Design a protein with these regions (language model features):
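Alpha-helical transmembrane segments of multi-pass integral membrane proteins
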Residues: 13, 23-26, 40, 226-279
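Single conserved hydrophobic/aromatic residue that forms the stacking wall/gate
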Residues: 1-7, 11
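Structural signature of hydrophobic alpha-helical transmembrane segments
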Residues: 35-38, 71-84, 178-186
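Generic multipass alpha-helical transmembrane bundles of integral membrane proteins
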Residues: 110-113, 119-242
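Hydrophobic transmembrane alpha-helices
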Residues: 12-64, 70-71
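Short, highly charged, low-complexity non-transmembrane loops/tails of multi-pass membrane proteins
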Residues: 259-307
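Long, low-complexity, intrinsically disordered segments
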Residues: 302-322
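Membrane-interface helix-loop-helix junctions at boundaries between adjacent transmembrane segments
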Residues: 49, 62-136
Length: 322
């Protein structure tokens, strides 16, 4: 049974990696597929199959190569700017957030699907604070590529006098002069921090509260920020994207943190040095009769337990008792 379960997990991971990689490659081909030889669906399928047997970082690397080739087909100057950007991103990524490859891939994908708000909420629920660096990389990458797409006529024009310098300035301006990108970076990073802090709190329905606060902060912040920057026509998109992101976030909660608060147990016990007061909330997928809960009192010296024994008895992480 264990072998069968392990094999099933391997296949599931491969399917997930294939799906994410294929979606990323198809979006690259659709939006910036300037090199026609590599911008076909069969090529995307083959590369996604290769990525399914590689670590997730393999998809990030292959996606970077595809983008650089497309940028080269558009303009050598844009390719150089993109290469410098990727080098800086890889330094930031490998230094602070090497185990959050999905964040780098999924963030531009979610932007392309108009549901970017799910990323800071989802990462705040499932990851640690340092995952914000992969989120930042994904946001910067999306806005750079989107800016290149919007200015492809200028960037892909025939070389003229001073044209090379002009192309570099236009490419750099997609990053350095993009006020909307700075707005999105600030709001999404703060959202991730808010969601992370709330879901760590010892309150009932912490994940649900974190999701609601996070989505509301993003929606209100983006609408207000767009008004300040004079960006119009995005309110409906923001509201619809927020609703869809909220639904996805609650699906994440159901899959990873589905608790039954109606069966909450408050426990007290002691060891030689401390008294412990613990609130134990069972998972909703576990039947009430499947778990035996033993209550410990300071008056029952024979039932004293160390934190380690208690954690083993309750099948919880010992660190949760700290």
């Amino acid at each position: 049974l264990l072998a069968s379960s392990a094999a099933s997990d391997v296949y599931k991971r491969q399917v997930i990696k294939f799906t994410v990689a294929l979606t990323a490659f198809l979006l690259i081909n659709h939006n910036i597929g300037y090199m026609e030889k590599i911008s076909s669906t069969p090529i995307a399928l083959i590369l996604a199959l290769i990525c399914s047997i590689l670590p997730v970082g393999g998809a990030v690397f292959i996606g970077s190569v595809l983008i650089l080739l497309d940028m080269y087909a558009l303009s050598v100057e844009v390719c150089i700017v993109a290469l410098i950007l990727f080098i800086l991103m890889y330094i930031l990524y490998f230094r602070f957030s090497p185990k959050n490859e999905y964040g780098v891939l999924l963030t531009p994908i979610c932007f392309g699907l108009n549901i970017p708000f799910v990323m800071p909420v989802g990462m705040g629920l499932l990851r640690e604070l340092y995952s914000m660096f992969s989120l930042v990389c994904g946001i910067v990458l999306y806005f750079f590529l989107n800016g290149v797409k919007q200015n492809e006529t200028t960037l892909g024009g025939v070389d003229e006098k001073d044209a090379a310098t002009s192309k570099i300035v236009v490419a750099l301006n997609q990053l350095l002069g993009n006020r909307e990108m700075y707005l999105v970076l600030a709001i999404m990073v703060v959202t991730l921090v808010i969601v992370y802090i709330i879901r760590k709190m010892s309150i009932e329905h912490a994940w649900a509260v974190a999701i609601i606060f996070g989505i509301l902060f993003e929606a209100v912040g983006m609408i207000a920020g767009d008004m300040v920057l004079g960006i119009s026509g995005k309110t409906i998109t923001i509201l619809v994207g927020s609703i869809i992101s909220c639904v996805i976030a609650f699906v994440i909660q159901f899959l990873f943190f589905n608790l039954d608060y109606s069966r909450t147990e408050r426990l007290q016990f002691e060891d030689d040095e401390y008294y412990y007061y613990v609130k134990a909330v069972p998972k909703a997928i576990v039947a009430g009769t499947d778990k035996k809960v033993t209550r410990f009192s300071g008056k029952e010296e024979q039932d004293r337990m160390t934190k380690k024994r208690f954690a083993e008895e309750m099948e919880i992480d010992e660190d949760l008792l700290d």
